[in-house]
UniProtKB/Swiss-Prot annotation:
This protein's name: Putative magnesium-dependent phosphatase YER134C
Organism of origin: Saccharomyces cerevisiae (strain ATCC 204508 / S288c) (Baker's yeast)
UniProt binding sites for substrate: 75
Keyword Magnesium: yes
Binding site for Mg(2+): 11, 13, 141
Cellular component GO terms held in the UniProt record: cytoplasm; nucleus
Catalytic activity: O-phospho-L-tyrosyl-[protein] + H2O = L-tyrosyl-[protein] + phosphate
Keyword line: Cytoplasm, Hydrolase, Magnesium, Metal-binding, Nucleus, Protein phosphatase
GO molecular function: acid phosphatase activity; metal ion binding; protein tyrosine phosphatase activity, metal-dependent
Length: 178
């Protein structure tokens, strides 16, 4: 059994939500609030509706409940859009509706390798950039990022652009099946 990592890193585009935030979205953004106060869908000024993948709140919540540090690792060239929508999306965690951004402990952006994102994030979280010093996983939709495995990071390939990371994929990761 793989079990829980120390750090779980998530790409954003096609891993948290089904679009490229730096090309599909233009602010301002209108939140669509559900009856329980969550905001799982936003609408951009062009009318494009964006809903986070349905299992993301459950996956992130389970990781947080088990003491895992959460990190974004995104190559987006428009981090200000990603940051804004992470603050607008709201999910229920520990009985409270909170911005999705609040679930993350570290944010890494920029057009560079995921290895760079992970090293810098680890440096900020633990004052070390040695990727083998912690148990780390990366959820990502781009197979090229499997290169992180050369550095001891478990790569969890999110193959389904319509549904994103499913609870089953997540459970398969935890049990060592992927």
């Amino acid at each position: 059994m793989t079990g829980y990592p120390d750090v779980a890193a998530f790409d954003l585009d096609y891993t948290i939500w089904p679009c490229y935030c730096d090309t599909h979205l233009h602010g301002p953004f209108k939140p669509v609030k559900s009856s329980n106060g969550e905001v799982l869908t936003i609408i951009c000024r062009d009318g494009y509706e964006l809903t986070i993948y349905k299992d993301i709140p459950r996956i992130l919540g389970d990781l947080k409940d088990n003491g895992v540090k959460l990190m974004t690792a995104s190559r987006t060239w428009a981090p200000e859009i990603a940051q804004e929508i992470l603050k607008i999306f709201k999910v229920k965690y520990a009985g409270v509706v909170t911005p999705l951004a609040n679930l993350f402990d570290e944010f890494q952006w920029g057009e560079r390798s995921k290895i760079g994102h992970l090293r810098d994030g680890l440096k900020d979280l633990y004052n070390t950039s040695d990727l083998k010093s912690k148990k780390i996983c990366l959820f990502d939709d781009e197979s090229r990022n499997k290169e992180v495995e050369k550095y001891g990071v478990k790569f969890v390939y999110v193959r389904d652009p319509e549904n994103g990371p499913s609870w089953k994929l997540y459970q398969d990761y935890l049990s060592g099946k992927v």
